[in-house]
Amino acid sequence: MSDKKVRARFAPSPTGQLHVGNARTALFNWLFARQQGGTMILRIEDTDLERSEARYEQQLLDDLKWMGINWDEGPDVGGPFPPYRQSDKIDVYREHAERLVAEGKAYYCFCSQADLDAYREQALKDHRPPIYPGTCRSVDPAEAKRRRDSGEAGAIRLRIPERPIRFHDIVHGDVEFSNEVVSDPIILRSSGVPVYNYVVVVDDAEMQITHVIRGDDHLSNTPKQVALYEALGWAVPEFAHLSTILGPDRERLSKRHGATSIATFREMGVLPEALVNYIALLGWAPTGGTREIFRPEELVKEFDLRRVTPSPAIFDFEKLYWLNRHYIKEAATYRIAKLARHYWDRMMIDKIAHRVGMPKLDPIHVAQWGASNEVDEWLSKVTALVVPSVNKLDELPERGKVFFDYDAAAALANPDNAEVLAAPKTTDVLAAFTTRIANESAPLTAERFKAIVNEVKTETGVKGKDLFHPIRIAVTGTHSGPEFDKLVPLIEEGASLNLPIAVKSVKERVAEFASARN
């Protein structure tokens, strides 16, 4: 690799959300720049004015920052090579294109779209590469000027040299393209709008980019870009084309596989350090060993572009969620409690909307249901209790059903509970347990609940799962879940709070269960 100070860039188009593939490209550029002590540049490629939107640009910036990816130069922080937004330098692209025409390295093409379609169709019929046949290559410059002056629209095409185009790729090695399969590319449309393959070269050269790290879907664009660098008299940067990311079915990763955008993973409750850790391992591996857990600072230290593989990477959702579970467990309790509040709020909003018969309820209608220290503290404790069993934070409401969704009739009808409820000793256990709970007048503590269970054990002679499973079903609706010594006090505390969706106390639950069972 070059000895020049590294200048790497991520250049997204603000035409949609940031997806896994582009996020990996951004991450690898960032890791490489930071590992090499170089400069990270963010450039917005928004020449597609019809599809580019400010909201997408802001979302891109937000997602990158959420991932921990920062930049030294960009549209929001400035830098020595402005502007960092392509739409602000259209005139620059036109000037360079006209210079190429003046030097005979490019020419005006007057072929209509119908002509181009006909060329392509015939080439395919003849089993030839469907490249532009060079119809306007020989048009005399004076004739081209006359036609343009008369109002005829013309695009500008680069003259591809009549020789193979070669370049070295850090991932793929030495690459060669025959000029017989590379068309003279349009660099400036007849409308005056420059095309991607052209503007990216101008920008990379003017911003002194030393390494172009991007997806291998751009590999076929590279010979045209190399030819442009040479025609413009600029140094060709080093290239590293990252492998394709495939879904579990070995097809190109897409929405049909599930979440693919960073915004969606964020909403699902995937932590940034988990996503960064996982994406970094898509097509790259550290030197030696089988280690899988890497903090961002460790990734920076370990990252080496030469260890990026050209083989496709498989996106394993379960592996990502396994990593996320690891990072959730390692995260500070207060941080997870703060993040979890979003999911509890959304759950409560949905429940209230369902209760009042509305398909959707704005958060303002919840009247700040948890705007109290007592509710905050209780939710933090609930989160701490159930979060070890989740892979993503959006699973919290499902685990929280033990507090908010107690339904005795549903518990009795649940086939998973059938074997326990039909056991010979269950009736005696539930009768003794129900009687004792009914006689309690104060909220149950962990110690008092344990004492009651021991009394039932002594009275009935039943122990182990034959004792605990029926009691758990009566209290929670299911025969598995958190330990009673932590669960029962939280149920009782929740029942004492003024929540819009009430938490039933243990006494209320057991009475409801007994009534439904009789």
UniProtKB/Swiss-Prot annotation:
Its EC number is 6.1.1.17. A motif ('KMSKS' region) lies at residues 252-256. The keyword Protease does not apply. It holds the Pfam family Anticodon_2. GO terms for biological process: glutamyl-tRNA aminoacylation. Catalyzes the attachment of glutamate to tRNA(Glu) in a two-step reaction: glutamate is first activated by ATP to form Glu-AMP and then transferred to the acceptor end of tRNA(Glu). This is Glutamate--tRNA ligase 1. It comes from Koribacter versatilis (strain Ellin345).
